[in-house]
A protein has these predicted regions:
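Extracellular polysaccharide-targeting segments
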Residues: 31-69, 81, 124, 133-186
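Surface-exposed coil/turn segments at beta-strand junctions on protein surfaces, enriched
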Residues: 9-11, 23, 55, 80-82, ...
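Non-cytosolic beta-sheet module surface loops
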Residues: 8-10, 22, 79, 89-94, ...
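Extracellular carbohydrate recognition and processing domains
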Residues: 105-128
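Exposed beta-strand face motif in extracellular beta-rich ectodomains
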Residues: 12-16, 85, 128-130
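Extra-cytoplasmic beta-strand recognition segments
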Residues: 45, 66, 71-100, 118-125, ...
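Extracytoplasmic soluble-region selector
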Residues: 1-37
Length: 186
């Protein structure tokens, strides 16, 4: 089996012409759909004091003040790949953190998460869905009004930001605890 990689094309539908090197008269056009490198799915969301809308370029516009630290917005969607992924936020809003968590078939969080600016992470076995979160990292959240570009992609190398294929997934409020919160004493 041969793999065909298409580069330099914008996401959408196109045709690929495949021709024989032995007999150039033998060729065929194959319709293909070029998908975004950005694996995230998101869209409008509101909850915990924050509101997100989708800009015309596919980035998110986030406004409001989170209700508390580690509160914010989240979107859950089917996991589109296996292997290693990396998360980057080339355009960010100070005081908001982005992460992607791995969920099993029952919606329970599996070990690990991928955070923006961190290393590439192997998707754990049993992952069925991903949960993309934008949470306040401030102890006392302040008002936000800005644009954010986030990209989750396969592999361990981050590339230039692309609009994700799905920017119409409704999101909602999320409240999470950082890993260290699980180890606090009462």
């Amino acid at each position: 089996m041969t793999t065909i990689t298409i580069t330099g094309k914008k996401p959408g539908k196109t045709d690929v012409t495949i021709s024989s090197t032995v007999n150039p008269a033998v060729k065929t056009d194959v319709p293909v759909t070029v998908l975004s490198r950005n694996l995230l799915s998101y869209g409008p969301a509101e909850g915990n004091g924050l509101t997100a809308t989708v800009n015309t370029d596919g980035s998110l516009h986030v406004t409001g003040a989170a209700a508390r630290q580690w509160a914010g917005l989240g979107w859950t969607f089917p996991c589109p790949v296996q292997g290693t992924v990396i998360l980057r936020t080339p355009t960010f809003i100070a005081g908001l953190s982005t992460s992607v968590k791995f969920l099993d078939a029952k919606g329970h969080q599996l070990d690990g998460q991928v955070t923006s600016g961190g290393n590439a992470v192997a998707i754990p076995a049993g992952t069925v869905s991903l949960r993309f979160e934008i949470l306040s990292s401030e102890a006392t959240p302040t008002a936000k009004d800005g644009d954010i570009r986030v990209q989750l992609e396969s592999g361990d190398t981050a590339h230039e930001w692309m609009r994700p294929d799905n920017t119409s997934l409704r999101g909602g409020g999320r409240i999470s605890e950082p890993v260290s919160a699980c180890h606090r004493t009462a």
